[in-house]
């Protein structure tokens, strides 16, 4: 009986310790700590795995590794939204054109976007934006920005023209920006090299690592062409293999640019005079609601993430007319860093905007 009591107490103590550890971890992750972002930048800036730019009323308050090219993840979708607005303003596309959901679904890769595409569809249904299994082209663009749907982004790259979007990089003076390529087809790259290029399973990751960026893009475009045609895609039947080792390669191959590029772009959006008024109006229509704080006259943001990357671009003008732009980029994150940064980026941005005391720390 004594032995059973000892075992019982031991189990109780172990459970209590586990609960205490979980409670401490929960507090650590959820604790509002805008300083964490600054501390992270200070700790990792010499590794060149992060960058930060902050500008207020035209004055640069902070700049770290602003010329270092890093993976953008979904932050790159800002460029697609700007080109969308340009083509709307030039009447090259009709924002109210009705797009069949099926045209988007062919680019959707289940369980690879943290539920973004299904969440957008659910939201669109609630708002009665879907009629006869169709919705407007503008809704597709808003789904790309507000919900970060990769399927919508790939569709828009096709609709607007991949070459046209890549040409817009020069027009927007994004001088360090990599060329765009489809968002969803690269997810099939491991299955593709094993099935179509007959690479043994135990060698496929190494083959992917050794591909030049031009070769990688070329294969991604080939897969994309198959995905466009339902019959062709079924015929090839490429398996989806997205284990963490592959995701690291995929993440490293994402489109890259510098914080300086995106500071330039969001600055143009925030000053409201760099683009023709119809284009600016459409940009604001797409981004409206991405920042829900009433302290702003107008504001917008778009971030991106992978298991290793976290990025965010924010622009805002407060009710007193103060203009703030913030670009944060990071790579090589571990899971704890990623979660803590995600939890505190919005607090960090708000502190920069509202607190002179916090700005003195920059």
Description of each model-found segment:
Residues 1-3:
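N-terminal secretory signal peptides that target proteins for export/translocation
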Residues 6-19, 25-38, 46, 61, ...:
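Structured C-terminal helix/loop/strand segments within mature extracytoplasmic catalytic/sensor domains
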Residues 7-9, 52-59, 99, 106-112, ...:
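Short low-complexity stretches enriched in small and charged residues
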Residues 22-79, 83-190:
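Active-site-adjacent loops and short helices of periplasmic peptidoglycan-processing enzymes
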Residues 102, 212, 355-356:
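Helix N-terminus capping/helix-initiation residues
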Residues 110, 170-171, 182-183, 194-196, ...:
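Alpha-helix boundary/capping detector
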Residues 121-129, 195, 200, 308:
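Carbohydrate-binding/catalytic loop surfaces
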Residues 141-261, 265:
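Mid-domain, small-residue-enriched loop/turn segments at the edges of structured enzyme/sensor domains
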């Amino acid at each position: 009986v004594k032995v059973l009591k000892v075992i019982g107490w031991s189990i109780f103590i172990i459970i209590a310790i586990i609960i205490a550890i979980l409670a401490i971890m929960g507090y650590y992750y959820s604790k509002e700590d805008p300083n964490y972002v600054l501390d992270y930048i200070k700790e990792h800036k010499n590794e060149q795995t992060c960058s930060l730019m902050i500008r207020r009323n035209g004055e640069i308050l902070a700049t770290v590794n602003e010329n270092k090219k890093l993976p953008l993840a979904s932050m790159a979708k800002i460029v697609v939204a700007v080109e969308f607005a340009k083509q709307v303003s030039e009447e090259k596309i009709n924002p109210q054109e009705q797009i069949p959901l099926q045209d988007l679904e062919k680019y959707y890769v289940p369980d690879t976007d943290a539920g973004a595409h299904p969440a957008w569809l659910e939201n669109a249904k609630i708002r009665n934006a879907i009629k006869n299994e169709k919705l407007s082209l503008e809704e597709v663009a808003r789904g790309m920005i507000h919900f970060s749907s990769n399927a919508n982004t790939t569709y828009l790259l096709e609709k607007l023209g991949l070459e046209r979007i890549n040409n817009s990089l020069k027009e927007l003076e994004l001088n360090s920006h990599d060329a765009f390529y489809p968002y969803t087809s690269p997810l099939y790259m491991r299955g593709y090299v094993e099935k179509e290029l007959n690479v043994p399973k135990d060698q496929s990751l190494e083959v992917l690592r050794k591909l030049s960026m031009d070769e990688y893009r070329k294969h991604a475009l080939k897969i994309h062409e198959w995905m466009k045609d339902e019959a062709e895609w079924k015929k090839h039947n490429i398996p989806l293999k997205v284990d963490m080792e592959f995701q690291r390669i995929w993440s490293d191959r994402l489109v890259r640019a510098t914080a300086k590029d995106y500071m330039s772009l969001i600055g143009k959006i925030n000053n409201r005079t760099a683009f023709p008024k119809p284009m600016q109006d459409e940009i604001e229509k797409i981004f409206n609601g991405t920042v829900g704080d009433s302290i702003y006259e107008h504001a917008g943001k778009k971030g991106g993430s992978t298991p290793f990357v976290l990025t965010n671009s924010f622009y805002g003008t407060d009710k007193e007319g103060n203009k703030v732009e913030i670009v944060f980029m990071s790579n090589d994150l571990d899971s704890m860093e990623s979660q803590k940064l995600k939890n505190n980026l919005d607090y960090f941005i708000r502190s920069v905007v509202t607190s002179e005391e916090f700005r003195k720390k920059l």
